[in-house]
UniProtKB/Swiss-Prot annotation:
This is Succinyl-diaminopimelate desuccinylase. Zn(2+) 2 binds at D107, E141, H363. GO terms for biological process: diaminopimelate biosynthetic process; L-arginine biosynthetic process; lysine biosynthetic process via diaminopimelate. Catalyzes the hydrolysis of N-succinyl-L,L-diaminopimelic acid (SDAP), forming succinate and LL-2,6-diaminopimelate (DAP), an intermediate involved in the bacterial biosynthesis of lysine and meso-diaminopimelic acid, an essential component of bacterial cell walls. The gene is dapE.
Length: 390
């Protein structure tokens, strides 16, 4: 019989559901079973959008009044890749030599299992003077269109308001509790299309090669750093991700070149001011080249939901930091490094922090978590829940 206070049992049950985005594969059904046994009211809305898969989500709530703590996460996982590369099958949740193997062990079914077990332990000993909810999506590893962003709006329309949120993403690096995330850099992407005129390489005067202009545009974007970072954020960085002419012939001047890039930006910028800076740099190159003549460029911005943010709720950060210290003996580092997460949506509704297992093996073959790390995180979550409602 499954024991709700045992995070390993819960985690094994979740891993055995092959919930690769956007498939639910029984993961939310397992969660619903756990949570209903604990007294939660559970709903599972399905969201749709054009050109996307339908995605099932879960919202569970307990309590009627007082401070409202949200735990947020996702049950969807990335594909396991070649099964023969795994030491153990990725959806069998095998335990060997002090580790639990399986896709989603750390990203992030482990965090969900630890929080549920921690809450079950708290409820065995005392009642909570407040409200607890779990906001769990099946669309975090995919497009994130039919997941947390819509689930938050759906819950808000039902009258839900939150005091604070904890996202159980794998933020720890070497040991559980060494790092918590109190913010994230923003993310924005663009596509530069340089239009030229195709021709034979032996007759360049009859063509307009887009590559020299593309090189100048790239230099304008990358030669000067966007900034040097701030007190809470590392420097913004622009990275080229694709340079493509679609031309496989060595004797043909291509008709166009496409350059794709992504920028991770800190709190010195807004999305608007950053776009202005990029457009300014590019326009200066075009003016020097030949305005309105071949070759010329076009810039397209890709819609992004990843704005920069920083949580400044000292009480929330302090409660979590003290809970970590009470279990591990050390205070965590407060960080804003790394990629984006669904915290970028939650920050519009309440203060949010992120804290979970060490993530060294996430998205990798043989993704795994140490058994003692699972117990440590559960103990920290338990202490955090108790202290949050004091």
């Amino acid at each position: 019989m499954l024991v709700l206070t045992d995070p390993l049992q819960l985690l094994q049950a979740l891993i055995r559901c092959p919930s690769v985005t956007p498939h639910e594969a029984g993961a939310l059904s397992a969660l619903e079973q756990f949570l209903k046994k604990m007294g939660f009211h559970v709903e599972r809305p399905i969201f749709t959008d054009k050109n996307t898969d339908n995605v099932e989500n879960l919202y569970a709530k307990m309590g009627n009044e007082g401070p409202h703590l949200m735990f947020a996460g996702h049950t969807d996982v990335v594909p396991p890749g070649a099964l023969e590369d795994w030491t153990y099958p990725p959806f069998e949740a095998v335990i060997d030599q002090g580790k639990l193997y399986g896709r989603g062990a750390v990203d992030m079914k482990g965090g969900i299992a630890c929080f549920i077990a921690a809450l079950a332990r708290v409820l065995e000993k005392r009642s909570i003077k407040g409200r607890v909810s779990l906001l769990i999506t099946g669309d975090e590893e995919g497009t994130a269109i039919n997941g947390t962003v819509k689930l938050l709006k759906w819950a808000e329309k039902k009258g839900e308001k939150w005091t604070a949120a904890l996202v159980g993403e794998p933020t720890s690096v070497k040991t559980v509790g060494d790092i918590i995330k109190i913010g994230r850099r923003g993310s924005i992407s663009g596509i530069i299309t340089v239009k030229g005129r195709q021709g034979h390489v032996a007759f360049p005067e009859r063509a307009a090669n887009p590559l020299p202009l593309a090189s100048k545009l790239i230099q304008a974007l990358t030669q000067i750093a966007l900034d040097q970072g701030t007190e809470n954020f590392q420097p913004s960085n622009l990275e080229l991700t694709t340079i493509d002419t679609g031309n496989l012939a060595v004797n043909v001047i291509p008709a166009q070149t496409t350059v794709r890039f992504n920028i991770r930006y800190n709190d010195l910028w807004t999305k608007e001011t950053l776009m202005e800076e990029i457009e300014k740099r590019l326009s200066l190159v075009q003016e020097k080249n030949n305005s309105g003549q071949y070759p010329f460029y076009q810039l397209e911005w890709i819609p992004s939901l990843g704005d920069v943010f920083l949580t400044k709720n000292d009480k929330l950060i302090q409660v979590l930091s003290n809970a970590i210290k009470s279990v591990t003996g050390s205070l965590p580092e407060c960080s804003t490094s790394g990629g984006t997460s669904d915290a970028r949506f939650i920050k519009d509704y309440c203060p949010v922090v992120e804290f979970g297992l060490p993530g060294q093996t996430m998205h990798m073959v043989d993704e795994c978590v140490a058994l003692d790390a699972v117990e440590t995180l559960t103990a920290i979550y338990e202490r955090f829940i108790i202290d949050f409602f004091v």
